[in-house]
């Protein structure tokens, strides 16, 4: 914790904002981890509420926002799209949100023999994520 606290202090000294990424979603006790992150002085925490997607973790995200009580920004992220963004923002009480608005694209890679290093469930070695302006615009529009 001391090393993390020092890192946050250095970032703040240089005028940077500090966001703790989704590591909190792996914590045994998310609310205790949230208190630890608040004590570090971070500005926000990106979370899916301990679930695969923020929609699935919506109840926990709302509770995190309640527990945080304005001491830190709870930023839902993970699986956010045009079909669920409004509900995620409303139910969680979040004022900020994170989403990729991406499509999975087949790689142009031709050589495909040998061992795959990425499980097929994650798209395999021969796909990549690419931001989609259309998906981003649809998701933003869905908040209005």
Residue ranges and their predicted role:
Residues 1-2, 17-27, 43-55, 75-77:
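Catalytic beta/alpha-barrel core
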Residues 2-3, 25-40, 64-74, 80-99, ...:
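Catalytic cores of alpha/beta
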Residues 58-67, 87-92, 106-144:
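C-terminal helical cap(s) of enzyme catalytic domains, especially alpha/beta-barrels
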Residues 2-3, 29-32, 52, 56-59, ...:
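Alpha-helix N-cap and loop-to-helix initiation/capping positions
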């Amino acid at each position: 914790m001391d090393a993390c606290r020092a890192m946050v202090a250095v970032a703040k000294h240089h005028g940077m904002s500090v966001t703790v990424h989704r590591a909190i979603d792996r914590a045994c006790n998310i609310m205790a981890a949230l208190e630890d992150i608040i004590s570090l002085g971070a500005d926000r925490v990106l979370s899916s509420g301990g679930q695969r997607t923020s929609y699935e973790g919506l109840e926990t995200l709302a509770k995190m926002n309640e527990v945080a009580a304005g001491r830190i920004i709870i930023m839902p992220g993970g699986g956010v799209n045009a079909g669920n963004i409004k509900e995620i923002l409303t139910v969680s009480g979040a004022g900020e949100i994170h989403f990729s608005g991406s499509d999975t694209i087949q790689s142009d890679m031709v050589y495909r023999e040998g061992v795959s290093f990425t499980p097929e469930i994650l798209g395999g070695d021969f796909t990549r994520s690419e931001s989609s302006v259309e998906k981003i615009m649809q998701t933003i529009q869905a908040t209005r």
